[in-house]
Design a protein with these regions (language model features):
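Membrane-interface helix caps and helix-loop-helix hairpins in membrane proteins
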Residues: 176-186, 240-242
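The cytoplasmic-loop to transmembrane-helix boundary for the fourth helix
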Residues: 2-20, 135-175
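C-terminal transmembrane-bundle signature of multipass membrane proteins
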Residues: 8-14, 20-30, 195-275
C-alpha cells in the first residue's frame, strides 16, 4: 500500500511539472497563438480535434493506471504500467502538437524556429515508443532464452539495452542532423516504420507462443501495422497542414482510431489467458 501511495505521488508530481511547463510555454506565445486562431482558417477546428484526442487519451491512460494499481504487487516493469506510460507520453505529445501546429503558421515563425520545435516533437515520439519496445523485447528475449541455453538473463538484459541504445542513437542522429523541416518530416518516418514493423512482429510472435497474458498481443500487432499506414498518411498530411491547419483534423481522426485499437489490445486478454 505504501508503495502504491509513493507511485501515485510520483505521477502527481510529474503531472504538475509537465502541466506547469506547458502553461509557461502557451503563456509565453499566447499573443501569437491567438492571432493564428483568429486569422487562419481551420485553426480552431484543429485545436478542438486535438483537445478531443487528449481527453480520449487521458481516459485510456487512467483506465490502464487503475488496472495497474489494482494489482496486489506493482512494478514499473508491469505491462499495465508501461501501456499507461505509452498513452501518457502520447498525451504530452498531443498537447505539444496543439502548440506546434499553431506556432508554425504564425507570422514570426522562422524556418529555423519551426525546425527546432518540430525536432522536439520527434524527440517525444522517440520516447513514446520506448515503453512498448521494452515490453516487446523483454517478452521476446525471455522466450528466446528458453531455446538458447548458453545465454543467461544478464546477457539478455545487455542485448535488450543494446537494442534500445541503438534505437535511441539512430533516432537522435536523424533528429539532430536533419537540415530542413521537409527532410525531418520525410526521413524520420522511414525509421519509425521499421520500429513499428519490428514491434508488430514481436507481438505476433508473443501471441503465437502465448507469452503475454495481460493483453491481446495479436490485436496490438495488427494495431502497429495500422500505425505504419497512419504514419505515412500523417507525414503527407503534416506537410499539407503547414498551409492548411484544418487538414490536421483528418490526421487526428485516423490516429484516434489506431490508438483505440491499440488500447483495446492493451485491455483485452487473449483467448489462451481465459482458458
Amino acid at each position: 500500500m505504501e508503495k502504491k501511495k509513493r507511485y501515485k505521488s510520483y505521477l502527481a508530481i510529474a503531472g504538475f511539472f509537465i502541466g506547469s511547463g506547458f502553461g509557461l510555454l502557451f503563456a509565453f506565445s499566447w499573443n501569437e497563438l491567438v492571432i493564428v486562431l483568429n486569422l487562419v482558417d481551420g485553426a480552431w477546428l484543429a485545436v478542438i480535434s486535438g483537445i478531443i484526442r487528449i481527453i480520449i487519451l487521458v481516459i485510456m491512460s487512467s483506465i490502464l493506471f487503475a488496472k495497474w494499481f489494482k494489482q496486489e504487487t506493482i512494478y514499473t516493469s508491469d505491462a499495465y504500467f508501461l501501456f499507461a506510460l505509452f498513452f501518457s507520453i502520447l498525451i504530452v505529445g498531443k498537447i505539444y502538437d496543439i502548440y506546434n501546429n499553431l506556432i508554425v503558421v504564425s507570422e514570426n515563425a522562422t524556418a529555423e524556429f519551426v525546425l527546432f520545435i518540430t525536432k522536439i516533437r520527434y524527440l517525444i515520439v522517440t520516447m513514446n515508443i520506448m515503453p512498448v519496445l521494452y515490453i516487446g523485447l523483454e517478452t521476446t528475449l525471455a522466450l528466446i532464452s528458453a531455446y538458447i541455453k548458453n545465454v543467461n538473463k544478464s546477457q539478455f538484459n545487455k542485448i535488450r539495452l543494446g537494442i534500445v541504445g541503438i534505437y535511441l542513437a539512430i533516432m537522435l542522429l536523424i533528429i539532430i542532423i536533419a537540415p530542413t523541416l521537409s527532410a525531418l518530416i520525410f526521413a524520420l518516418p522511414y525509421f519509425t516504420i521499421g520500429i513499428y514493423l519490428l514491434l508488430a512482429i514481436m507481438f505476433f510472435f508473443m501471441y503465437k507462443n502465448k507469452r503475454l497474458s495481460q493483453a491481446n498481443a495479436l490485436l496490438i500487432g495488427i494495431a502497429f501495422l495500422c500505425l505504419i499506414a497512419s504514419s505515412i498518411i500523417r507525414s503527407i498530411i503534416t506537410s499539407i497542414a503547414l498551409e492548411n491547419p484544418s487538414m490536421i483534423v483528418v490526421a487526428e481522426v485516423i490516429t484516434i482510431i489506431v490508438n483505440f485499437v491499440i488500447f483495446l489490445g492493451f485491455i483485452t486478454k487473449p483467448k489462451y489467458a481465459k482458458m
